[in-house]
């Protein structure tokens, strides 16, 4: 986990976490260059994807104010750095109680509450925590999922990956082919069984690295010596490539899994699953951790609404309706990206004896590899998958209008119900996302001087009568934003997704129907 997607940074922004995490990550000037190499012993890499730095992406966001861009650029930050940052924030919050080392032994769901039995690591004693709801974010082997009797579709795939985290300042040798974020190393498939045998990730652009050694089923390669594994992966087709290693931080073996929980909630809808507890995917595309954060951003506001008393029963049911199809979508594209990487050997006959040769055969092979890599570059560029998926659920107010067709590579701005609202900068330079509240927000575009409109008044009166907290963001003279959003009135959820849109509401009853459905009180 070393990529925090732009959508995740949008989520962290209203939580007050985006800037702090960015300060801990790789400096924003460094690009996301992905290289393809037959081994660092060769003079040059075979091809590269020149993905922009966070600064370059932010410049594009500022200049391309047409709704197609995210509000925040992506971020390079390793998982351990991110976890340490979030731990600090939890320790600072009076709303969070931390119990590190404690283990959950049993979760029991009833119609009115959840009983969670936990064990103290120091005394071995157990206690019961009673709550209205519980969320199992306890990983792929989730005890919460098992206690709820929820099965998984799918499971481990027939390969493994050896991960070695290490420190080295031998930059002359590591950067022989140029700086990189990732470098994938090609191997002769007649020897390795696959076209990509490993990779190296630059975790901090200073001295921390991770080598991935992809193991085919039945691999006889030894994993006893981490240094030898690193040399072999870096050398790829050219044989071992020694570097000076300052420290081996950790070595582990990981078995990739593609699995999806049959349900995201217990039978009584008081226990929920999020993250790897309900979906596991291969890391291609960087969807895994980012998907889990989006899960809890969706679920969090809904549980808050239930606890605060303004949410209806459909809210908790909508979590699975919305998030499980997104997991299926991202699992699919993760497999597509991995298939393109591993499919190189089917498109190009890789041969270690000629790949670095200066003759016509070597030149032809290198050119074919370059063409294949450039023609299959969606790996970290599927912004439609990230931003353009639709939430289908009973709390989304259906619309007779059509929505843009799904394009995995690009996001088409739309306020069609169920889609993420488009980011746009307003006339004063502020972001429209920063106008959203912690509950529902009615965005109201006003052409002339500000004043109450019938639409806004109907929604405001309905919200007051039914004790539904509603922010009304009246935007005056915002022609560009209104054109991009395509409607005069848009009801936006706390997670930035659209509940309803229209140019007007003709009556208070219509506003009531929209608001009560968006808050989960009526089913469509």
Curated annotation (Swiss-Prot):
Disruption phenotype: Does not affect the production of oxopyrrolidines A and B. Keywords: FAD, Flavoprotein, Monooxygenase, Oxidoreductase. Pfam families: FAD_binding_3. It comes from the Eukaryota. SUPFAM superfamilies: FAD/NAD(P)-binding domain. It is an enzyme of class 1 (oxidoreductase). Its EC number is 1.-.-.-. The keyword NAD does not apply. FAD binds at residues 48, 145. Pathway: Secondary metabolite biosynthesis. GO terms for molecular function: FAD binding; oxidoreductase activity, acting on paired donors, with incorporation or reduction of molecular oxygen, NAD(P)H as one donor, and incorporation of one atom of oxygen. Belongs to the paxM FAD-dependent monooxygenase family. PANTHER family: FAD-BINDING DOMAIN-CONTAINING PROTEIN-RELATED, TRK SYSTEM POTASSIUM UPTAKE PROTEIN. FAD-dependent monooxygenase; part of the gene cluster that mediates the biosynthesis of oxopyrrolidines, polyketide-amino acid hybrid compounds with feature structures of tetramic acid. Does not seem to play a role in oxopyrrolidines A and B biosynthesis. May be involved in further modifications of these oxopyrrolidines. This is FAD-dependent monooxygenase opdD. It comes from Penicillium oxalicum (strain 114-2 / CGMCC 5302). The gene is opdD.
């Amino acid at each position: 986990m070393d990529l925090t997607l732009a959508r995740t940074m949008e989520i962290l922004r209203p939580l007050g976490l985006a800037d702090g995490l960015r300060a801990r990550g790789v400096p924003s000037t460094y690009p996301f260059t992905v290289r393809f190499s037959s081994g660092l012993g060769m003079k040059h890499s075979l091809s590269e994807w020149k993905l922009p730095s966070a600064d370059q992406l932010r410049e594009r966001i500022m200049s391309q104010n047409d709704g197609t861009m995210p509000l925040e650029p992506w971020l390079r930050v390793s998982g351990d750095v991110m976890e340490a940052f979030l731990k600090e924030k939890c320790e600072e919050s009076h709303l969070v109680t931390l119990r590190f080392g404690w283990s959950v032994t049993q979760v029991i769901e009833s119609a009115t509450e959840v009983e969670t039995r936990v064990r103290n690591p120091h005394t071995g004693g157990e206690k019961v925590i009673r709550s209205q709801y519980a969320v199992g974010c306890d990983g792929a082997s989730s005890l919460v999922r098992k206690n709820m009797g929820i099965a998984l579709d799918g499971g481990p795939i027939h390969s493994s990956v050896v991960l070695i985290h290490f420190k080295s300042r031998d930059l002359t040798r590591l950067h022989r082919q140029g700086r990189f974020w990732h470098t994938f190393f090609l191997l002769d498939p007649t020897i390795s069984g696959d076209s990509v045998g490993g990779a190296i990730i630059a975790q901090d652009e200073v001295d921390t690295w991770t080598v991935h050694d992809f193991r085919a089923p039945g691999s006889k390669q030894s994993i006893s010596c981490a240094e030898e594994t690193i040399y072999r992966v870096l050398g790829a087709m050219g044989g071992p490539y020694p570097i000076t290693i300052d420290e081996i931080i950790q070595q582990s073996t990981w078995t990739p899994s593609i699995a999806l929980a049959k349900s995201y909630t217990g039978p009584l809808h008081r226990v929920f699953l999020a993250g790897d507890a309900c979906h596991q995917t291969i890391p291609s595309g960087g969807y895994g951790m980012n998907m889990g954060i989006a899960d809890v951003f969706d679920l969090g506001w809904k549980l808050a609404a239930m606890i605060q008393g303004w949410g209806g029963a459909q809210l908790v049911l909508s979590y699975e309706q919305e998030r499980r199809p997104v997991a299926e979508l991202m699992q699919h594209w993760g497999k597509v990206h991995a298939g393109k990487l591993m499919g190189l050997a089917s498109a190009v006959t890789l041969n270690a004896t000629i790949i670095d040769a200066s003759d016509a055969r070597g030149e032809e092979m290198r050119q074919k590899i370059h063409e294949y890599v450039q023609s299959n570059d969606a790996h970290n560029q599927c912004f439609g998958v990230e931003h353009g998926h639709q939430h289908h659920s009973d709390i989304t107010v259906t619309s007779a209008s059509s929505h843009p067709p799904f394009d995995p590579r690009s996001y088409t701005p739309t306020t069609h119900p169920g889609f993420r609202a488009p980011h746009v900068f307003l006339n004063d330079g502020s972001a429209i996302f920063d106008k959203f509240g912690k509950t529902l927000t009615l965005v109201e575009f006003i052409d002339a001087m500000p004043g109450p409109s019938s639409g806004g008044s109907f929604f405001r009166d309905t919200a007051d009568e039914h004790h539904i907290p509603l922010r009304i963001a009246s935007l005056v003279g915002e022609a560009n934003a209104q054109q991009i959003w395509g409607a005069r009135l848009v009801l936006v959820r706390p997670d930035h997704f659209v509940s309803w849109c229209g140019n007007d509401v003709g009556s208070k009853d219509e506003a009531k129907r929209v608001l009560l459905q968006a808050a989960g009180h009526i089913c469509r």
